[in-house]
């Protein structure tokens, strides 16, 4: 999640804390716990240990039992990498064109359609109960954790206690830590299974602990609200419950790309020269999940694609380097054909493409910039 970004978490976007999760560009590690980098393993820190002692008193004063604290903090500890990630967040902004290309990539759409079909009965039951479009719920799932594949493996007790101790947003994260302990105390999850992102976002749809407390649903009826389970039912129902409580209107779409006809809602054009979108009240409800306009458009567009719609019909202007999407795809294809693998040709310039450009430039004795350009494209013809 993003603190002000998202209430639930992107799956795609920038790091922040919103409702249940994350943001606009990348995703979490899928490594096994033993594969976590060293800086995300507990490290000795006497000041942290002393803080935990004082925190225990405050937690017990709020109804957390000594037994819960003992169990939850067994094996927990200070994670230096969490502090580093919190302090080194950068404002990395993609264009809307790039963001939507990632959010509704062919692979994400294909996986989304498969997930939608596989969990159709559950999704339709959730839609019947809440009124929230099953495709919207599926799209949020896809952006937040790639349909459950990238939920994060960092212990939530360690992550939130580290951030509460570190102090930059100590009061906020102490509330999240207390909420996480209540979840354990309630029996929804064992502390050892409560894992998520470095910021404490959890489960299939990347819920922060306080949001879990207020909105989590035991859809399966097993007595636990398990948003981490291989069965995503509780997590999907929780996401729908959040949207319902924030004003989702049954039977109303999120909006549409405005290609023809008169608008019926609020028209937005997030990227100058790009497509316009006619948005509804439900679009604004999605923004309660994550206030990023790009995120909400990503959810809506991915949901449409999961439902069988095609790509956007409108075009975007050339980028800052003078390249259109087709130019960027051609550049990636030509670099790969020359032996400089860009790891795919989607028109999005990322680190793989920049590395391939740099390697090509070095092989030709050119200044190594890693920057795409029309001249570079022409040289590859």
Residue ranges and their predicted role:
Residues 69-92, 141-145, 155-157, 260, ...:
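Acidic helix-start/capping segments at beta-turn-to-alpha-helix junctions
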Residues 35-57, 62, 67-71, 75-76, ...:
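Extracytoplasmic and endomembrane cell-envelope/extracellular-matrix remodeling and assembly machinery
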Residues 84, 150-154, 194-195:
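Short, solvent-exposed loop/turn and secondary-structure capping segments
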Residues 74-121, 125-126:
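Signal peptide-directed extracytoplasmic domains
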Residues 49-64, 105-143, 153-154, 162-171:
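Export/targeting segments at the very N-terminus of extracytoplasmic proteins
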Residues 323-328, 336-380:
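Short acidic, glycine/serine/threonine-rich helix-capping segments at coil-helix boundaries
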Residues 1-27:
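N-terminal export signals
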């Amino acid at each position: 999640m993003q603190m002000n970004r998202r209430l639930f978490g992107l799956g795609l976007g920038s790091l922040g804390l919103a409702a249940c999760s994350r943001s606009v560009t990348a995703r979490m590690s899928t490594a096994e716990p033993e594969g976590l980098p060293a800086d995300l393993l507990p490290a000795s820190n006497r000041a942290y240990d002393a803080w935990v002692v004082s925190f225990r008193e405050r937690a017990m004063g709020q109804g957390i039992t000594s037994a819960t604290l003992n169990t939850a903090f067994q094996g927990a500890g200070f994670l230096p990498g969490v502090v580093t990630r919190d302090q080194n967040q950068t404002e990395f902004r993609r264009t809307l064109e790039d963001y939507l290309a990632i959010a509704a990539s062919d692979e994400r759409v294909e996986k989304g359609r498969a997930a939608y079909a596989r969990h159709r009965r559950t999704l339709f039951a959730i839609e019947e109960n809440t009124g929230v479009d099953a495709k919207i719920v599926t799209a949020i799932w896809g952006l937040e954790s790639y349909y459950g594949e990238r939920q994060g493996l960092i212990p939530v007790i360690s992550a939130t206690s580290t951030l509460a101790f570190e102090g930059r947003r100590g009061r906020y994260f102490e509330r999240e830590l207390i909420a996480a302990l209540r979840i354990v105390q309630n029996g929804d999850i064992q502390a050892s299974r409560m894992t998520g992102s470095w910021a404490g976002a959890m489960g299939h749809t990347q819920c922060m602990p306080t949001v879990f407390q207020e909105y989590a649903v035991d859809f399966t009826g097993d007595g636990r609200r398990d948003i981490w389970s291989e069965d995503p039912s509780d997590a999907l129902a929780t996401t729908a419950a959040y949207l319902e409580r924030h004003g989702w209107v049954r039977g109303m779409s999120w909006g549409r790309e405005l290609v023809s006809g008169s608008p019926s809602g609020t028209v937005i054009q997030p990227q100058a020269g790009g497509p316009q979108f006619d948005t509804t009240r439900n679009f604004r409800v999605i923004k309660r999940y994550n206030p990023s306009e790009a995120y909400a458009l990503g959810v809506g567009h991915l949901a449409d694609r999961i439902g069988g719609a095609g790509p956007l019909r409108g075009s975007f202007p050339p980028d800052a380097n003078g390249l259109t999407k087709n130019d960027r795809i051609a550049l990636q294809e030509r670099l790969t054909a020359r032996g400089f693998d860009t790891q795919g040709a989607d028109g999005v310039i990322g680190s793989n493409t920049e590395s391939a450009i740099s390697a090509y430039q070095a092989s030709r004795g050119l200044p190594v910039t890693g920057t795409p350009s029309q001249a570079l494209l022409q040289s590859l013809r």
